[in-house]
Protein backbone atom coordinates (compact mmCIF):
# COMPACT_ATOMS: atom_id res chain seq x y z
CA UNK A 1 0.00 0.00 0.00
CA UNK A 2 1.54 3.32 -1.05
CA UNK A 3 1.25 6.66 0.75
CA UNK A 4 -1.75 7.83 -1.26
CA UNK A 5 -3.65 4.60 -0.60
CA UNK A 6 -3.03 5.04 3.13
CA UNK A 7 -4.34 8.60 2.98
CA UNK A 8 -7.47 7.34 1.25
CA UNK A 9 -7.94 4.69 3.96
CA UNK A 10 -7.72 7.36 6.66
CA UNK A 11 -10.16 9.58 4.77
CA UNK A 12 -12.63 6.70 4.35
CA UNK A 13 -12.54 6.02 8.09
CA UNK A 14 -13.12 9.70 8.86
CA UNK A 15 -16.07 9.87 6.51
CA UNK A 16 -17.86 7.35 8.73
CA UNK A 17 -17.98 10.06 11.43
CA UNK A 18 -19.77 12.53 9.16
CA UNK A 19 -23.56 12.55 9.42
CA UNK A 20 -25.99 13.99 6.90
CA UNK A 21 -26.88 17.57 7.74
CA UNK A 22 -23.60 18.34 9.50
CA UNK A 23 -21.82 21.68 9.43
CA UNK A 24 -18.34 20.55 8.51
CA UNK A 25 -14.93 22.19 8.65
CA UNK A 26 -12.82 20.95 5.74
CA UNK A 27 -9.05 20.92 6.06
CA UNK A 28 -6.17 21.62 3.72
CA UNK A 29 -3.47 19.34 2.33
CA UNK A 30 -3.10 16.11 0.41
CA UNK A 31 -4.91 13.88 2.93
CA UNK A 32 -7.74 16.38 3.37
CA UNK A 33 -8.12 16.48 -0.41
CA UNK A 34 -8.67 12.72 -0.49
CA UNK A 35 -11.41 13.27 2.09
CA UNK A 36 -13.00 15.97 -0.08
CA UNK A 37 -13.09 13.60 -3.07
CA UNK A 38 -14.81 10.89 -1.04
CA UNK A 39 -17.22 13.39 0.50
CA UNK A 40 -18.11 14.72 -2.96
CA UNK A 41 -19.12 11.21 -4.05
CA UNK A 42 -21.55 10.99 -1.13
CA UNK A 43 -22.89 14.49 -1.80
CA UNK A 44 -23.56 13.51 -5.41
CA UNK A 45 -25.70 10.68 -4.05
CA UNK A 46 -27.84 13.00 -1.93
CA UNK A 47 -25.79 13.27 1.28
CA UNK A 48 -26.29 16.73 2.81
CA UNK A 49 -23.49 18.75 4.38
CA UNK A 50 -22.46 22.38 4.53
CA UNK A 51 -18.71 22.81 4.43
CA UNK A 52 -16.44 25.59 5.64
CA UNK A 53 -13.06 25.40 3.88
CA UNK A 54 -9.79 26.24 5.63
CA UNK A 55 -8.08 27.61 2.52
CA UNK A 56 -8.75 28.98 -0.93
CA UNK A 57 -7.17 25.82 -2.32
CA UNK A 58 -9.68 23.62 -0.49
CA UNK A 59 -12.52 25.92 -1.50
CA UNK A 60 -11.60 25.58 -5.17
CA UNK A 61 -11.55 21.78 -4.95
CA UNK A 62 -14.91 21.70 -3.16
CA UNK A 63 -16.51 23.95 -5.77
CA UNK A 64 -15.03 21.85 -8.57
CA UNK A 65 -16.41 18.62 -7.05
CA UNK A 66 -19.78 20.00 -5.96
CA UNK A 67 -19.40 20.11 -2.17
CA UNK A 68 -21.66 22.93 -0.84
CA UNK A 69 -19.76 25.67 0.98
CA UNK A 70 -20.50 28.45 3.43
CA UNK A 71 -18.24 30.97 5.10
CA UNK A 72 -17.41 30.69 8.79
CA UNK A 73 -19.35 33.91 9.35
CA UNK A 74 -22.41 32.19 7.90
CA UNK A 75 -21.79 29.04 9.97
CA UNK A 76 -19.90 30.22 13.06
CA UNK A 77 -20.49 26.99 15.00
CA UNK A 78 -19.46 23.73 13.34
CA UNK A 79 -20.20 20.12 14.25
CA UNK A 80 -16.94 18.60 13.08
CA UNK A 81 -13.68 19.44 11.35
CA UNK A 82 -11.71 16.87 9.37
CA UNK A 83 -8.12 17.85 8.66
CA UNK A 84 -4.69 16.38 8.09
CA UNK A 85 -1.46 16.91 10.02
CA UNK A 86 2.24 17.12 9.30
CA UNK A 87 3.00 15.41 12.61
CA UNK A 88 0.87 13.91 15.39
CA UNK A 89 2.04 12.42 18.68
CA UNK A 90 0.33 9.94 21.01
CA UNK A 91 -1.27 12.80 23.00
CA UNK A 92 -2.74 14.15 19.73
CA UNK A 93 -0.56 17.23 19.78
CA UNK A 94 -0.06 18.28 16.18
CA UNK A 95 2.22 20.19 13.89
CA UNK A 96 0.22 21.66 11.02
CA UNK A 97 0.76 24.31 8.42
CA UNK A 98 2.92 22.66 5.79
CA UNK A 99 0.33 23.77 3.25
CA UNK A 100 0.36 27.33 4.58
CA UNK A 101 -3.20 27.38 5.94
CA UNK A 102 -2.52 27.06 9.68
CA UNK A 103 -4.31 30.25 10.79
CA UNK A 104 -7.59 29.40 9.09
CA UNK A 105 -7.21 25.75 10.06
CA UNK A 106 -6.90 26.69 13.72
CA UNK A 107 -9.80 29.17 13.60
CA UNK A 108 -12.07 26.58 11.98
CA UNK A 109 -10.99 23.81 14.36
CA UNK A 110 -11.65 26.07 17.36
CA UNK A 111 -15.16 26.77 16.03
CA UNK A 112 -15.93 23.03 15.88
CA UNK A 113 -17.41 20.70 18.45
CA UNK A 114 -14.85 18.06 17.44
CA UNK A 115 -11.74 17.82 15.32
CA UNK A 116 -10.66 14.57 13.71
CA UNK A 117 -7.15 14.34 12.28
CA UNK A 118 -6.41 12.01 9.38
CA UNK A 119 -2.91 10.93 8.41
CA UNK A 120 -0.77 8.10 7.14
CA UNK A 121 1.47 6.36 9.65
CA UNK A 122 4.57 8.32 8.61
CA UNK A 123 3.08 11.34 10.41
CA UNK A 124 2.82 9.58 13.80
CA UNK A 125 5.83 10.53 15.95
CA UNK A 126 7.05 10.04 19.50
CA UNK A 127 8.09 13.70 19.89
CA UNK A 128 7.07 16.63 17.68
CA UNK A 129 9.64 18.62 15.78
CA UNK A 130 11.24 16.61 12.98
CA UNK A 131 8.89 18.47 10.64
CA UNK A 132 9.78 22.17 10.62
CA UNK A 133 7.29 24.17 12.70
CA UNK A 134 5.43 26.74 10.57
CA UNK A 135 5.12 30.13 12.29
CA UNK A 136 2.84 32.63 10.56
CA UNK A 137 4.16 36.17 10.93
CA UNK A 138 3.13 39.68 9.99
CA UNK A 139 5.34 41.11 7.21
CA UNK A 140 5.79 44.30 9.26
CA UNK A 141 8.81 44.08 11.54
CA UNK A 142 9.81 40.69 10.22
CA UNK A 143 13.43 40.91 11.37
CA UNK A 144 12.38 41.90 14.91
CA UNK A 145 9.89 39.04 15.02
CA UNK A 146 12.54 36.59 13.85
CA UNK A 147 14.91 37.75 16.61
CA UNK A 148 12.11 37.34 19.18
CA UNK A 149 11.50 33.77 17.97
CA UNK A 150 15.23 33.01 18.28
CA UNK A 151 15.23 34.31 21.87
CA UNK A 152 12.18 32.22 22.78
CA UNK A 153 13.80 29.13 21.28
CA UNK A 154 17.04 29.74 23.19
CA UNK A 155 15.18 30.11 26.50
CA UNK A 156 13.60 26.70 25.90
CA UNK A 157 16.86 25.07 24.85
CA UNK A 158 15.86 24.88 21.18
CA UNK A 159 17.97 25.76 18.19
CA UNK A 160 17.81 25.38 14.44
CA UNK A 161 17.33 27.23 11.19
CA UNK A 162 14.51 29.75 10.84
CA UNK A 163 13.73 29.85 7.13
CA UNK A 164 11.37 32.36 5.54
CA UNK A 165 9.19 30.21 3.29
CA UNK A 166 9.53 30.93 -0.40
CA UNK A 167 7.26 30.34 -3.37
CA UNK A 168 8.00 30.57 -7.08
CA UNK A 169 8.00 34.37 -7.16
CA UNK A 170 9.41 35.36 -3.77
CA UNK A 171 8.17 35.08 -0.21
CA UNK A 172 5.25 32.73 0.31
CA UNK A 173 2.12 34.66 1.26
CA UNK A 174 -0.77 33.06 3.11
CA UNK A 175 -4.44 33.56 2.26
CA UNK A 176 -4.44 36.17 5.04
CA UNK A 177 -1.52 38.13 3.58
CA UNK A 178 1.13 36.94 6.04
CA UNK A 179 4.48 35.18 5.68
CA UNK A 180 5.64 31.90 7.22
CA UNK A 181 8.87 31.15 9.04
CA UNK A 182 9.66 27.43 9.11
CA UNK A 183 11.51 26.66 12.35
CA UNK A 184 13.64 23.50 12.15
CA UNK A 185 14.07 22.72 15.85
CA UNK A 186 14.47 18.97 15.29
CA UNK A 187 12.77 18.02 18.55
CA UNK A 188 10.26 19.92 20.73
CA UNK A 189 10.14 18.25 24.17
CA UNK A 190 7.74 20.84 25.66
CA UNK A 191 5.27 21.83 22.96
CA UNK A 192 2.98 23.57 25.46
CA UNK A 193 5.75 25.90 26.66
CA UNK A 194 6.80 26.75 23.10
CA UNK A 195 3.19 27.43 22.12
CA UNK A 196 2.74 29.81 25.05
CA UNK A 197 6.00 31.65 24.34
CA UNK A 198 5.26 32.07 20.63
CA UNK A 199 1.79 33.39 21.44
CA UNK A 200 3.44 36.18 23.46
CA UNK A 201 5.33 37.59 20.45
CA UNK A 202 3.32 40.45 18.87
CA UNK A 203 4.55 39.77 15.33
CA UNK A 204 3.56 36.10 15.46
CA UNK A 205 0.07 35.80 14.01
CA UNK A 206 -0.24 32.06 14.69
CA UNK A 207 1.88 28.93 14.82
CA UNK A 208 1.47 25.33 13.75
CA UNK A 209 1.30 23.72 17.19
CA UNK A 210 -2.25 22.45 17.69
CA UNK A 211 -2.58 21.41 21.34
CA UNK A 212 -5.75 20.09 22.99
CA UNK A 213 -7.68 20.53 19.75
CA UNK A 214 -7.94 17.08 18.14
CA UNK A 215 -10.40 14.65 19.73
CA UNK A 216 -9.47 11.74 17.48
CA UNK A 217 -6.68 10.79 15.10
CA UNK A 218 -7.18 8.23 12.36
CA UNK A 219 -3.82 6.81 11.34
CA UNK A 220 -3.61 4.58 8.28
CA UNK A 221 -0.92 2.01 7.55
CA UNK A 222 -0.52 -1.07 5.36
CA UNK A 223 -2.77 -3.08 7.70
CA UNK A 224 -5.56 -0.48 7.59
CA UNK A 225 -6.69 2.45 9.72
CA UNK A 226 -6.50 2.69 13.50
CA UNK A 227 -7.87 5.30 15.85
CA UNK A 228 -6.13 7.24 18.60
CA UNK A 229 -8.29 8.94 21.21
CA UNK A 230 -7.37 12.12 23.05
CA UNK A 231 -6.80 11.37 26.74
CA UNK A 232 -8.18 14.49 28.38
UniProtKB/Swiss-Prot annotation:
Pathway membership: Carbohydrate degradation; pentose phosphate pathway; D-ribose 5-phosphate from D-ribulose 5-phosphate (non-oxidative stage): step 1/1
This enzyme's EC code(s): 5.3.1.6
Gene3D superfamilies referenced in this protein's UniProt entry, alphabetically: 3.30.70.260, 3.40.50.1360
Residues the entry annotates as binding substrate: 28-31, 83-86, 96-99, 123
Active site residues according to the UniProt entry: 105 (proton acceptor)
Keywords: Isomerase
Catalytic activity: aldehydo-D-ribose 5-phosphate = D-ribulose 5-phosphate
Name of the molecule in the record: Ribose-5-phosphate isomerase A
Superkingdom of the organism of origin: Bacteria
Gene Ontology molecular functions: ribose-5-phosphate isomerase activity
GO biological process: pentose-phosphate shunt, non-oxidative branch
Subunit structure: Homodimer.
Keyword field contains Isomerase: yes
Coiled coil: none
One Pfam family hit: Rib_5-P_isom_A
Family membership noted in the UniProt record: Belongs to the ribose 5-phosphate isomerase family.
InterPro entries: NagB/RpiA_transferase-like, Ribose-5P_isomerase, Ribose5P_isomerase_typA_subgr, Ribose5P_isomerase_type_A
